[in-house]
Amino acid sequence: AIPTQSCILTHVTNTLQLIERGAPVDLVFQSVAGTEAANSGFGINLAMLQEAREAALSLRRGTLGNNVMYFETGQGSCLSANAHHGVDQQTCEARAYAVARHFEPLLVNTVVGFIGPEYLYDGKQIIRAGLEDHFMGKLSGVPMGCDCCYTNHMMADQNDIENLSLLLAGAG
């Protein structure tokens, strides 16, 4: 059998309800951001994430380690929520990794290019942001993934996304 972990991409409160009902939850998913105001906009706080982590650990489904959290992030989330307090989006993203690191995640996945041209205008900016996120993930010591994507109204195309994917593979 292949070792597999299941995860439902839903709000953390829904996952807590599933755990309370006895569902077999392996990983708890939640989008996180780098400011308290942005996380509040997501309907979460640190105590809620801690409660979810403890609930998932109580199920004792893992056979190795205590990594039961899966977080998604992305440059621009604090800006789009007007919750950046004048701080640049890369710094806000690095702060999101600090939030995630506290909960010993299995994966922190940046979804670079998802928000659109308001925050990352073109393919060059998507590539830059993806490499910044990868670098900050390494510096922060979080298990980092990168979902390279773009919205159709951006000045980007599939070649930009493939270039970023190759650069990330080379960066390790």
What residue ranges belong to the model's regions?
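Anaerobic metallocofactor- and corrinoid-dependent redox/one-carbon enzyme cores
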Residues: 1-172
